[in-house]
């Protein structure tokens, strides 16, 4: 197997990606797919770090998304490549390409390979909240993450808090469900407190109307 992911690279070669199709790369790699994925991941880090440090002006980070796609096609369960790759893609200029939509697409690709990976759903929610200022979409993804096997108990309250800001009616419905069904006393307490706060906000809004 001969890969353009091998390191170190010469300065002229570092901006060239000979294989851009993950399917083609998988065919070339045969039984060496995990190794090839590791090599492409190393090149991804080199590419992102190099352009970030030098503040490259000529098509900065141009290979970032193709490299991440190759890496995760060669190894569909490469958790670090999905999670850190999404951070790289979403990072705003000049420190990154500022492509949150590509970051979300990468994490959604990860969910296709591992549908119950709550971390990917949580990361998508965070990108919606932090990079896209879309609290409603963030709340839906946090809620989805909280429902996945192995998700930590704190995810429910995070989703509830975000949803309260984005969609009070939906938040109230979910908070009541959480308060009634959770086996964790502290989760029920948070849900009940958020419900009380939400009701107070609605009462104030009616008085001001």
Task: State the predicted function of each range.
Residues 1-5, 108, 133:
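Surface-exposed peri-terminal alpha-helical interaction modules
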Residues 1-80, 85, 181, 199-209:
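N-terminal alpha-helical interaction modules that lie
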Residues 4-7, 117, 151-152, 170, ...:
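Intrinsic low-complexity, intrinsically disordered or marginally ordered coil/linker segments
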Residues 15-21, 56-65, 95-104, 129-136, ...:
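Helix-turn-helix repeat elements of alpha-solenoid scaffolds
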Residues 32-53, 74-92, 115-130, 151-162, ...:
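Amphipathic alpha-helical repeat scaffolds of TPR domains
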Residues 62-63, 99-111, 135-147, 168-184, ...:
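Alpha-helical repeat scaffolds
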Residues 67-68, 106-107, 123-124, 141, ...:
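Short, hydrophobic/aromatic alpha-helical segments in well-folded domains
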Residues 122-135, 161-172, 197-207:
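Short secondary-structure transition/capping segments
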